[in-house]
């Protein structure tokens, strides 16, 4: 992670120190992706163990670098790490009277064709809707969205992600992926149409 700037130097130790200073076993934390550079579960195990050993209830969202996590294997991961970690994909978790819903998301960064981008974004919207509907079926009507990618592409005033947030009357949209101060304003921050947008990248 040092490639993203000096503040990432010794980032593991910094995160551990700050986490243990602020988080207790009674807290719920959603980590919005990029948990490991590991290409498979064996390679990612050390990083996941690091997270497991931190205090609090930990809910993990899939990031673009999480090669160990195939979306189709989410239930397998939940079974494997039961009581230790919770994996958020095509499902939801509760926090007080809120349903925590989420998906990786997608925005256009110029690395693929528009057609491919639109296909992937539509797939992510479909997955997010599955989360919403699972929560609704369980009786929830208050929602917080978690994404890995920002909810809009640079320059967009809205997107399918902001529209679905309005459709389900969510209170917050929390996302990451944007590293380095030059990228902190890539998408919405603060209140837009009554919804609070928060960038929570590690830096």
Predicted features and spans:
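Core catalytic region of metal-dependent phosphoesterases/phosphodiesterases
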Residues: 2-95, 157-170, 193-201
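Acidic, low-complexity terminal tails and accessory targeting/binding regions
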Residues: 175-196, 202-203
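Short glycine-rich loop/turn motifs that provide flexible caps or phosphate-binding loops at active sites
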Residues: 32, 62, 101-104, 175, ...
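Conserved catalytic scaffold of divalent metal-dependent phosphoesterases
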Residues: 66, 71-157
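His/acidic metal-ligating clusters that form di-metal
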Residues: 15-28, 52, 116-185
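Short aromatic-enriched loop/helix-cap "lid" or pocket-rim segments at secondary-structure transitions
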Residues: 1-2, 71-74, 112, 185-188
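Catalytic metal-binding/acid-base residues of hydrolase active sites
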Residues: 35-36, 64-66, 105-106, 150-152, ...
